[in-house]
């Protein structure tokens, strides 16, 4: 029988940061096991706690025993959009729709508050994450290489409010255009290691003027 799940903001649920941190580490072990590295995966409990303090967190709880099964952490920018920091589901519960339930609750919550879209990044070397985002209405709109990550990353955007460029059939075309521009900028301005090359350094200096 399928478990009954309750979705709440952590402001309501009051799950301790230690439990959130433990779930985060368990959920993202798959990444390190697959050789995917990122600075966020090395955060201490104290650093993780500071992220939680300045973010909105939704949690998925077992309706019978209130066990923590999943969480989604995001922060709001300029009132127009939110940036997803991370989405974590207990390993034994992955593939059962908990992440999608969390997302659905959050979209309703954000629409009521006038948000227009969600953004996030994920490693290009994590196909399970890439496919989940595409399946749940996100579009790939960016490409980047960084000195601090072991693999290139994709930037995703999920429209949550009506918009001409982000309604079908224009949304896929808009996303492809943004992705192509981002891919070109990254490959023109950065080396394979993610460092800025001379073109990138010149562009950065000109933007500061």
Locate each region found by the language model:
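Conserved acetyl-CoA-binding loop of GNAT-fold acetyltransferases
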Residues: 133-144
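A short beta-loop-alpha structural element at the N-terminal edge
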Residues: 2-22
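Conserved acetyl-CoA-binding loop-helix of GNAT-fold acetyltransferases
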Residues: 89, 95-108, 135
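Conserved GNAT acetyl-CoA-binding A-motif
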Residues: 110-122
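Acetyl-CoA-dependent GNAT
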Residues: 22-85, 90, 103
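Conserved beta-strand-loop-alpha-helix junction that forms the acyl-donor binding cleft
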Residues: 120-130, 147-150
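C-terminal "cap" of GNAT-fold acetyltransferases
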Residues: 146-209
């Amino acid at each position: 029988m399928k478990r009954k799940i309750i979705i709440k903001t952590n402001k309501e649920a009051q799950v301790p940061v230690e439990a959130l941190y433990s779930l985060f580490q368990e959920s993202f072990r798959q990444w390190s096991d697959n050789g995917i590295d990122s600075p966020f995966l090395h955060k201490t409990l104290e650093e993780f706690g500071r992220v939680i303090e300045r973010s909105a967190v939704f949690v998925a709880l077992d309706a019978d025993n209130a066990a923590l099964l999943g969480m989604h952490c995001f922060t709001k920018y300029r009132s127009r959009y939110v940036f997803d920091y991370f989405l974590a589901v207990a390993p034994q519960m992955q593939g059962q729709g908990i992440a999608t339930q969390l997302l659905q609750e959050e979209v309703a919550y954000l629409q009521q508050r006038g948000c227009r879209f969600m953004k996030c990044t994920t490693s290009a070397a994590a196909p399970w994450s890439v496919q989940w985002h595409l399946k749940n209405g996100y579009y790939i709109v960016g490409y980047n290489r960084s000195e601090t990550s072991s693999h290139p990353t994709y930037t995703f955007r999920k429209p949550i409010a009506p918009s001409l460029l982000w309604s079908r059939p224009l949304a896929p075309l808009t996303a492809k255009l943004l992705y192509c521009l981002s891919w070109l900028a990254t490959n023109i301005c950065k080396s394979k290691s993610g460092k800025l090359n001379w073109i990138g350094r010149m562009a950065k200096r000109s933007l500061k003027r």
